[in-house]
Amino acid sequence: YEAAADRNAAERTKEDEQQDQSQFGSGEVRRSAGRDAVGAESPSCSAAGEVRDHKHRGCGHSNNDRDEYAEKNPQSDQHTRKATRVPRLLPFHVHCYGQIPPMSFEQAAIPSPPPPGYHVESFTDDERAVLSRFFTNVDGPVFGIVNLPEVVKGALFARYSRSPLSVRRLFLDEFVAEPDLGVNAIATTLDDEDSPVGLARAQGLYERVFTQYGDDSVAQLGGAHIACEQASNILTKALEWGRLASYLEQSTRYIFYDRRLGARYRYHIPRELSGTPLEDEYRETMDAVFETYSAMIGRAVPFYESLFPKQESDSAFVWRSTIRAKACDDLRGMLPAATTSNVGIFASGQAYEMLLLRMRANPLREIRDYADMMLTELRIMIPSFLTRVDLPDRGGAWSEYLASVSADLDARAADIVRPLEDRPEVTLVDWDPEGETKVAAAALYAASDLPDDELLAYVRTLPAEDRSALIRAAAGTRGNRRHKPGRAMERTSYRFDVLSDYGAFRDLQRHRMLTIEWQRLSTQHGYVTPDAIADIGATAAWDEVMERTATLANRIERFHGSVAAQYAVPFAYRIRYYIDMNAREAFHLLELRSQPSGHPGYRKIAQDMHRLIRDEAGHRTIAHAMQFVDHNTYDLARLEEERRLAARRAARGITDE
């Protein structure tokens, strides 16, 4: 097999050299038509007409990266991996060659090289023995969770939100020793048939059944849990793009980013900058930002403790959690988009396939690298669902299509040059003036025998009060915000253009049933400064961070393109995006995101949207039915929520530590 693979690799190299010369000519570096689709030419990729070990133009990835990593780390994943050296053809970025070579199942078993600066956790031999039974690898940033009850997998991901620890460390510290979970008992009963390697037989059975009876929808019926750790806040948005998947991300509300993870603070170093003159400046700036953030956290916590003293009725745990959330909320704007996070994903094979196709078409190396690592791990758990992702004429063609469309639109948008004018943070740009009439007609549809158009004609003849009565009947008597009206509310929609800080956008982007699209993060729209920054005496430090990161982002954009420059931009800078949602989804988003415990940034956006639906669209009956939208302001917003959670824990016999 190795000899055949080596011959295949040699033939591919020769074919690629011929294709390279025919497409690009001697010494020409192909660049996408779209602005910054790849970025500036890499010095390491501009040798005249050469393809050295498949160093890709615009990205510089080597075919030997994975093999070298596997050779240096033969025990990196003892339970499923083999140290056998199989030539690994890394995915060509579609902007480089326009074709993505396939990856065999054997190649998928070779560990992917981790991102630059990835912090590898240290585990004892005993810990590794336990982890190897339940995780598809022990060392990498991307891994699957296997052989555990579904509720335990969900609980593991749930802990991500409030913990700085990795899921593997959480599993060892909080789950393994828990007698009620029986993890140790599960581990002792597992054999090779239960391990990921044992999937080979099931895969063969599945393929026989699929060939006879299956279609694409079969891939909706099997799923997997996968973790992506130490991922930047640019990557997390790419991971969480798809609607039909479930995500849980580490929260900036509950975690201080004032401690280093290994040798540096929790930020990603993009490969686009590796080995360039800007890498040192990037590291120095990021270190300075996190040091300032750490100093301001140290100032904010005691300030809020004195401003909001503990009440006798509150436990120390509730009070500390509330103070911590307040400090995190106010200072998160300092964190750059390069800040790393942990993300847990549960999705079907079909959802993963589409996610990987999008990621492989992305111009950022980090996103493509994680796609490569995810494909490796998913092929251990659900290999049959992901056979097409890297086939040149299937997934390769699909990813190339996505990339070419993006590049074409980038080029066309670059021709539009207009000055940016001041406008409100939230603008209602489109709605149906007859929306309430249509909702009233839709409310009758399921209970009637008439066609849709005849019901609409009938409702148009009714007095306004009768139409409002139909909408109120469709909404019903709601006891809380979880009592949502039915699908009649989907008959009308609202389209908002929003210009908010990146932190608020991150929270709203998680609403995936609506339609949301965003522009690149940059410094051109300015930044927001919460009122609390002046209260804790941090205005000068805040402004200095914003100015210094803007300088760095502008330099990265100049030499490496605006896509890579996003990493340097803090959460406080504003990003433009639109949200298009029907009234039923508006019930969910506006009532949830305006709750007292929410962040002030997105609470204001939700409140503005509600006012615009009521006043500008004139849909007063629908707006009135959204009775749990909260327009009040709060000083210590999280306190009541923490009290409610404490009461729930007490009712179940759980004491706060």
Predicted feature residues:
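Short, strongly patterned local motifs
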Residues: 1-102
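A conserved ligand/cofactor-binding region detector
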Residues: 97-99, 103-657
